[in-house]
Amino acid sequence: MAATYAALTSVLGTIDKLLRSNLLVGLEEVHKQQLESLDKMFDTLQVSLIGKCDGGEPIITKGLQRRIKHVALYAEDKVESLMKQLIELDDDEQALECCRAKLDKVSQHVIQVTDFVEELIIKQKINNCPEAESSTSPRLDASIRENVMEGYNEERERMVQRLTRGSGSNRREVVSVVGMPGIGKTTFAKTILFDNSIKRVFRIRGWITVSNNYDLRKLLLVLLRDVIRMGDGNDNTMDIGKLAERVQQGLKGEKYFIVVDDIWSQKAWDRISHWFPDCGNRSRFLLTSRDREVGEYAATNPNESLVMRPLTQDESRCLFYHKVFGENYSIRGSDIDEFEKVGEKVVTNCKGLPLMITAVAGILSSKSKLDEWMEVAQSVSSLVNDDDYKQCLKVVALSYNNLPSLMKACFLHFGVFPKAHVISVKKLIRLWIAEGLINLKGVDEFEQVAARVLHDLIGKSLVIVEKRSLDGQIKTCRIHDLFHDLCMMEAESEHLLYVLRSDSTIMISQLYTNFRWISIQSENYDTFSSYIKARSLYNINDA
């Protein structure tokens, strides 16, 4: 969907520029009206694109999304060609007639697709949209989420001290832990929950996982049955209000510690926070979120929020070997030195992300040959077909799937850069604008909008700040390798991006009709002629 949304945003911006220019003087009023009609039709398509059925699935199917995208790209090419001709026009009636014919042809294509979409929406309303198939949460299973914590020793000590001794206030307080998916927030929170000091101070301790698709009734039942221990057979028949009252009664007068894991929105916190009474006895919450703004919103003191860091090389190594060989691990055999060397490469490739280290270690734990380890070490991305790696990607994909369409397109644009590439923020923002990703109608301050999008992506832990200026402004940024893999998978599946590397096997002649962005990351290319239909050609040679 992101590629289609980006194409529609871009063509709308191009039409808007033409309508506000002085280039239409030679055209008749009917052709100006055609442009305005095109503008309205593409606007309608963009609104329809983000529409959902009652079951939560998109109204516009993937096949139709591709068709809309191709029409939008075709229309933008023709409108830009029209602008070029109008600029060069010198009262040439033949050229003017050619411009009119182009507009007519584009309008016919758009009308066909728009009519089809409108018919589809009507049918969906009649049928009330089939409910989406139920699916299990893509968080990793118990084997990968095993409660093993390497590193963060100082952070744990400070957190326990903060929760048990507090700030001096007797009021109920919230401390937040924020960071990118897979960085270890949930495991960190588990170690805090089971810490002996926490057990001594808080009589009632509990855990609820909110997630992005939370069910208030289920959360209340978990609190009643597993935390407060006062659930009974009548709970299932109670409405949410009655269940909330029972939770409040059960916690009244108690000193409790509750972990609220994986919360996605301020609204979610507002909906559950009133369940917990403030009895003036220093009750505490530990809240985890991948969205920094959500964490700071809920925190009693936002400045005390813990931003999870990547593991150091030593911490990564300990976690890796623990996962590969077990708790009392040791490496034996004649190839011990070689295995350690290869293991070091694997650890380095995981860039300090615990979820990635755990997933890769889970794969290597079943491999006993040195050459198998060496194959994995060459590139972590070579594991893309492995089930554990796919599970790992599904976890981080949750953040991407919940982005607005505009932010999705901007996030996917990171894929044009090589892995671990540090990107100038100024350059990135200008590229987004040049690509038409920020061409919002009625918005003139494109750079401000782009900066806000980047800030939101950073706040949602999808983008890492690499360097700041002396006044605190972000100078450079990058994305984690795991997110880069996600970018590539999503962008290529939507025919938005193709990266031409030295090992690329696709025929050059196949590229010009299929991809919007071509990123050349190899010295071995011979011609640009075949890329003429691609909107953008990036030559990024990091050799």
Describe these PLM feature segments.
Residues 112, 116-183, 187-196, 200-203, ...:
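N-terminal flanking helix/linker immediately upstream of nucleotide/cofactor-binding cores
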Residues 78, 85, 89-131:
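Alpha-helical bundle protein-protein interaction modules that mediate dimerization/oligomerization
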Residues 4-7, 44, 49-52, 56-59, ...:
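Leucine-rich repeat
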Residues 79, 84-89, 98, 277-279, ...:
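Surface-exposed helical/coil interface segments that assemble multiprotein signaling complexes
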Residues 12, 18-21, 36-58, 223-237, ...:
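Non-catalytic, charged helical/coil tracts that couple and regulate nucleotide-powered enzyme cores
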Residues 1-26:
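Membrane-inserting effector segments that mediate pore formation, membrane fusion
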Residues 19-89, 103, 110:
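Extended, amphipathic alpha-helical segments that serve as helical scaffolds
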